[in-house]
Regions:
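Conserved C-terminal guanine-recognition region of P-loop GTPase G domains, centered on the G4
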Residues: 123, 130-180, 304, 308-316, ...
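Short aromatic-glycine-enriched beta-strand elements
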Residues: 50-54
Length: 336
């Protein structure tokens, strides 16, 4: 109705609610969602600049993500529906219209202050925390952080100690063996059958610092893998990045192994304080003696964990590692 007609009808033309506003257009909703259930399922084995290498039955193919997936990430280990040209012939390109529900997702953040979590690998059954006994020196804090991420993701952790020819593994084996974390050791030329037994028929992701021997281990387990290996800088004690992206390879005896790029930090800002505490099974029972609302930090008065260290019930290095993980984490639901 025009303003003149509104005025003649006695309606206040200064009242903007009297005017009809055009309705906001929206796309019509439909219940007829695309059905991809008849499409074959492949597994993403590597990613390179928007192209996804997938294993379908007994051959590999290259695919691109369908526009309908939008910003949804597709990561190594994902099980995906495939359509288009799935022959795997040279120059062919398939399409990924749907990502199947993930059983597990291993995540990390760049550091403890980064709010953006990154999904590393999907559908892994276990994680090998690859740690060199020397060159570079083992870092307990890194081991504990990956353990927290593994438990949070519902993935079984295994501590894999490499370069056992350079240093004695007994101290780390005793520390983590007492926490019911399986431990295996490797050295150049040693029999890898114990490692193979743990990998058979499982999907295992290798995580660790650069230079600890992940690619070397993968090359030994998968003939023809061709993963580039590097060396450790004598001045910094750090390894050089040789793997730039995650890659999944099928094991000769069954199962999959996923190599990941070396990391220098493993942030846990996506994990709540309660879940971090649950990952430190040797410390959790002691916190029952803490005052109500205790945050278990260095500044927390009368924290029972400090008394436990004083009485030799827990090692100082365990408490230091726990508090490092805890410092910048998300609050627990009960604290919100």
């Amino acid at each position: 109705m025009s303003p003149r007609r509104l005025a003649s009808s006695g309606i206040d033309t200064d009242d903007y609610s009297a005017f009809d506003r055009p309705r906001r257009r929206s796309r019509p909703r439909t219940k007829n969602r695309p059905d991809y259930s008849d499409l074959p399922i492949g597994q993403v084995t590597s990613i390179d600049r928007g192209r996804y290498t997938c294993r379908l039955d007994d051959h590999d193919l290259v695919a691109m993500k369908a526009r309908s997936l939008g910003r949804k990430a597709v990561i190594v280990g994902d099980r995906v529906r495939l359509d288009g040209d799935t022959s795997g012939a040279e120059g062919s390109l398939a399409r990924i219209p749907q990502v199947e529900r993930r059983r597990t997702v291993l995540r990390r953040t760049a550091d403890d202050t980064d709010p953006h979590e990154r999904a590393i690998v999907a559908n892994a059954d276990q994680i090998f925390i690859v740690t060199a006994l020397a060159q570079p020196e083992p870092r307990v804090g890194m081991i504990d952080r990956v353990l927290v991420a593994a438990y949070d993701a519902g993935v079984d952790p295994v501590l894999c100690l490499t370069k056992a020819d350079l240093a004695d593994p007994d101290e780390l084996m005793e520390l983590y063996g007492s926490l019911d974390v399986p431990v295996v050791t490797t050295r150049p030329g040693a029999d890898l059958d114990p490692v193979r037994d743990m990998l058979t028929d499982r999907t295992t992701v290798l995580v660790g610092h650069s230079g600890v021997g992940k690619s070397t281990l993968m090359n030994a387990l998968v003939p023809g893998a061709g993963r580039t290996t590097g060396h450790v800088n004598d001045a910094t004690g750090r390894g050089r990045h040789t793997s730039t992206s995650a890659q999944a390879l099928e094991l000769p005896g069954g199962g999959w192994i996923i190599d990941t790029p070396g990391v220098r930090s493993f942030g846990l800002s996506h994990v709540t304080a309660d879940r971090i505490l649950a990952a430190f099974g040797d410390l959790e029972p002691i916190t029952a003696q803490c005052p109500r609302g205790c945050e278990h930090l260095t500044s927390s008065p009368e924290c029972a964990l400090d008394r436990a260290v004083e009485h030799g019930l827990i090692r100082p290095i365990r408490l230091e590692s726990f508090r490092s993980c805890l410092l910048y984490t998300s609050p627990s639901p009960r604290d919100l």
